Amino acid sequence: MLIALSVMLAVFAALMIFQQVHSRRQKAVGEIVAERLHVSDLEKYVDSEYSGRYVDAILCEELKSSMLDVYNRVCDVERRSRILMSYNPSIAKFKDDFENLHSIVNAHNNRFKDDKLREHKAFFDTVLAYPLDDQQRRSIVSEEQNCLVVSSAGSGKTSSIVGKVEYLIQKKHISPERILLISYTHKAAAELTERMPHPGLRGYTFHKLALDIISAQSKCKPSICDNTDAVFVRIYRELAHNADYRKCLVEYFADYSDLMELDEDEKSKNVRRLQLGESTDRRYCALFPDMDGNEVHVRSGEEKKICFLLTSLGVDFRYEEPYEHQVADERHVQYRPDFSIHYMDGGKPCRLYLEHFGVDEHGMVPTWFAKDRGLTYEEANERYNDGITWKREVHKKFGTRLIELSSADFAYEKARQRLKRELVAAGVPIREVRSDELFDRILPENSMREKVFIRLTATFATLLKTSCRSMADVAADVAQRGDKRSRFIVGKVLEPVVVRYNEILRSEGKVDFTDLIVGATALCNANGGGNYDCIIVDEFQDISMDRYNFLLALRRGNPQAQLYCVGDDWQSIYRFSGSDMNLFCHFDQYFGKTDLNKIETTYRFGNPLVEKSAAFIQRNPAQIRKNIHPFSSDAKTEIVFREYSRGDAVGVLERIVAEIPLGKSVLLLGRYTYDDYLLAKNFRQRRSGNSLFYTICGREVEFLTMHRSKGLEADYVVLLNCNNGSFGFPSTIADDPVLGFVMSDSDGYLFGEERRLFYVAMTRAKVRTIVMYDKSKPSVFVLECISPERLADKPIEPHPNAGNRWTRADDRKLYKLYCGGMGFREISQKMGRSQTAIIMRLEKLGLIDARKPVRKF
């Protein structure tokens, strides 16, 4: 009894002590909060302390820093005793509010915007000839340090810019001289200046602004090289006289130039992914004609190289010439060997056949063989190898001579050496062509191939500067990748051009346009940025790394200038000129905390085009999501697809133009400048400056490339030649992979930039967009728009035993079968596993070496 009483007294004493300690700590924490804030409700505090003010990122960080000590002390108390926190809800609320301070600030800023919209309603209703919409107004009243306005086609981004400038001048009382307007073209900059005739306010291009800064700060106006294309032609002509460089170019075109097109594996992956397939008979044009002077179109890059090797060895050949004996039957069409080699032996004409088999050192076909044919991998492998066996048996039956090359020869042995050895052994006379003669035949002066190559060198040198990289940076990346092709092209082909280009500019005392931006950036960083309160940038989706650095330098100051950037990532189509969509889509990562505003009402076109175009572009997950809608539910814009048969394109176009009411504007758009070839052949042409017009059905209509059409509109827009193929739309002509070292990263989506270009083209119309296509080869984009349900991926069925573990008994059986001379196909059938699994297991057991050729089966 006494013990129980003692325990109760001890517990009571402990509770009293705890209550006293709790009371003191609670009071201490309460005093801490009260001392610093006077209130523990941060939401009320922010609204009170910053009443009528926008809390930008800088103010928010200052506010957070001023409370950090209190927050840390509250956390310290919480770590010591969570019970104490539960007794004081205001302290717990303070901690929760502090951890969600950005949300509290965002809510405060939204209320600030609402207040400003009510206060300045009359201004926004009348500042332009028509009232600005709510999204435009909210972006204009934002006072965040970084404001990105994500616009849409026809959404009035220029109106937003004009409204922003007028708001800054009329309502914020900012001097026009302290507002910097930047656009990408002289025409756009001049238009902005004309629409806002305030003394001291002027629209600039990046280059004009950079020129003025350099001229003012250096007291010397730079001399600009405004015809760099001519400089690169001059450099090419100089280097082409160097024997070593000529030899490098021959090697480039012989071994590496075919990668400027999508390789077959990539092509098949792309087609499968879209489920809208391009035909698998896609061809590569060989560098040289055959023995009859005919252009040769082969089926793969390796066959293209074989054509080059045969020509360089002085061997006459024809491609896919019918076999000299009739062998067609119910299962086989007439046999056409890959190459028929013709030569004289003792005055007698002879023929040798050369087959190129697309198998690796294990006799296995590429995975895309199965994908393109809708087969399992085992079925594709078996079918292809059956074809090899049949061809060999045909030659054996008729006593004709066959030599073979395979993909393995290109991977593990110099194909030239192997081919030469086989030809000599067969008795074919070899007359090797000198390197100089090969060069002259590959790159005739003023040929299209020469022009394309010069354009590649110019693009690389230009992008090297716009990406703010050096040759040392690129060389380091190439070395890290360990890519033989890239090392050769960058080091042997492109670097001499870059070095010579910079030498010429220095020797002539000139700079190019990118040099202007880089130079002005350096001056701004050294001497302080411009004296601006706000920098406004139009067409921000076209921003490049050099311009990004220039903007950072321009806004340097205390305080730094506010940045208001307007653009549409859905219309980012200039990656080949250096634009980097990452700078737009991840704006806050480059500039800091950002107020992102979307303007999603289009005033140009209506449904169904609004819905269809938005669905089309947003299939790319890299694009910013938007809820695009027309300004009126009554606005209607159609998109129609008009097919034509080969030879009837002109007639269909005439009927389309004839159906368009008189007085309505019309634009003809092509993916390429030469998409007007049918127009030029069939209609009267007129040039006016850079504009090209054709008279069709008695009315004059303008032809533009889709790139040039950006920013324009017409009542009716006709998209020409929306067909499949290398020079179709989307184009499957890929940039040379080495440009990847100086270009911004792509968005990773199949034909991402081509998709954006198609979106730009289809959204130029106010009344109707008409898409013309050849019904025998429609563009994958056309098929997607007509039948979007066909986009569903069709997965390749795995082997039924895929994933089954290999047991010791399995390994013993495999060892026995393989060492007994059985081939991969037979082992696969015996063991119920795929041929790929058999080969991989043999490699793991050390029975075959993947790096060396093995016996064929």
Predicted stretch roles:
Residues 78, 95-153, 161, 202, ...:
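Conserved helicase NTPase motor core
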Residues 148, 158-161, 273, 282, ...:
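Helicase P-loop NTPase motor core
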